[in-house]
Amino acid sequence: MKEPLIEVKREYNLIKTLTGKKFVVSTSIVVVLLIINMIFYGIRIHELAVIRRNSETHISSFNYKGQAQAQNKRVKNTRLFEKCKSKFNNFCIYGECMNIINLDKKFCICNKGYTGNRCDIVSIR
């Protein structure tokens, strides 16, 4: 089994003999480029952090100096329930009759102490 350190030294010596003194120069250039790269991206990361912080605290606004246009649309009925018509006054025994608008179904809102579909049962509670 070969020692890893011996193999690295052999490869280093092989590269050194193949490139001669150029190897030292190219290594220096790589080191300088790495340092420049670290400085550049260090500054960029700081700038990006500032941009992000500003975007999180920025509140956008705009000024509008125009006339509002009239809308000729009918407002849809947004109610779900309405009181029953007078002919259903006696539908709920001890409560108030309500109509589900879209289904035209009746239900009762019982007075305190009563329950059941038509508020006709005395509640035990």
From Swiss-Prot:
Domain EGF-like: residue ranges: 80-120
Coiled coil: none
Signal sequence region: 1-48
Entry GO CC: extracellular space
Protein's UniProt name: Probable growth factor FPV211
Record-linked InterPro entries: EGF-like_dom
GO BP annotation list: epidermal growth factor receptor signaling pathway; positive regulation of cell population proliferation; positive regulation of mitotic nuclear division
Keyword Coiled coil applies: no
Compartment(s): Secreted
SUPFAM superfamilies with a match to the protein in the record: EGF/Laminin
Taxonomic lineage of the native organism: Viruses, Varidnaviria, Bamfordvirae, Nucleocytoviricota, Pokkesviricetes
Entry keyword set: Disulfide bond, EGF-like domain, Growth factor, Secreted, Signal
Domain of life assignment: Viruses
Disulfide pairings: 84-97, 92-108, 110-119
GO molecular function, one term: epidermal growth factor receptor binding
